[in-house]
Amino acid sequence: MSSTRALLAAVLAAVAAISASVASAAYPERPIKLIVPWAAGGDTDVIYRTFAPLMQKELGGTIVVANVGGASGTKGAREAKDAPADGYTIFAVHDSIHSTYYTGVADVNYSDFEPICLVTSTPSIVTASPKTPWKDMKSLIADAKKKPGQITVGATLGSTSHFFPAMVEQAAGLKFKYVSYEGTAPRMNALLGGHIDLAESNLTQKGKADAGQLKFLAIASDKRHPEVPDVPTLKELGIDVEYAVNRGLLAPKGTPADVLAKLRSACTAAAKDPGFPGQMKKHGTLVRFLDHNGYTGFLRKNDALNKDLAKELGMLKR
């Protein structure tokens, strides 16, 4: 009797394995949800609404962008982590997955996922409301030193938009007052309306800066950017800060290897599409493709860097 049960168990296991293999071979059979853990209209949302159709061409299936905002990106991260590991949920991520984890805002980290690929990198810019009196970064610094804790900075607390000004604070010996916003779009609307003084932004806002609706004070790249040659780097102003927001794709831990291979192949094809760099340039970002092997090492290194930054900034909670 026991041998019969053992044989039956073996047969059932074999059938399950064959069924899983067939299902993976047919992947994708239904739409794939791409979770963007911030509000619609923000940088990550815009980038992946451009990128998803390029991935679709390679996959032969539909990718639907789903904005799951809240709790500094944590709500969407948790939903992605807890989704079935079947390839029908993928996660749009950037460096905040490290910063929110180490500042105690989130309980989800990059190690809860499988890497697909790194897609873009966007240098950060110190950006001021047009209603502020500062003509340049030097005048901001001088004013901030006269009134510590009075200049307001919009940020998603614990995220990259918080880490960047905190690094500037520390390097320049300043003290800002932070106002929390869930995502880029509401933060930039507050800045445009003069409800806050400063925020981290990037070249997606160049049109508004050119129109006088915002003021670019300094960029956090290693050298001046050709798109904004008159904007100095923080380093040339004596503020030793370089910072960029790096965006990639992850899948839930345990996603089948053959499904991951298809997602990675589609990500590679999309990132190498000849029209993609030009599309990203319009959105103020650079294509920075790394395959899953390169991205794995990048995530590991970036995680350690963010932990160190959280410690240096007095924000480490883990």
Model-identified regions with their sequence ranges:
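C-terminal lobe and pocket-closing loops
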Residues: 121, 205-272, 301-304, 318
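Bacterial N-terminal signal peptides that target proteins for export
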Residues: 1-11
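An extracytoplasmic/periplasmic, membrane-proximal ligand-sensing/linker region
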Residues: 29-31, 171-176, 257-318
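Hinge/capping helix and adjacent helix->loop/strand transition within the periplasmic-binding protein
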Residues: 79-88, 102-186, 239, 244-279
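N-terminal (or domain-start) structured segment
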Residues: 25-112, 149-150, 157, 161, ...
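Bacterial N-terminal signal peptides
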Residues: 9-19
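Solvent-exposed, polar/charged alpha-helical surfaces in well-ordered, non-transmembrane soluble domains
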Residues: 49, 53, 57, 78, ...
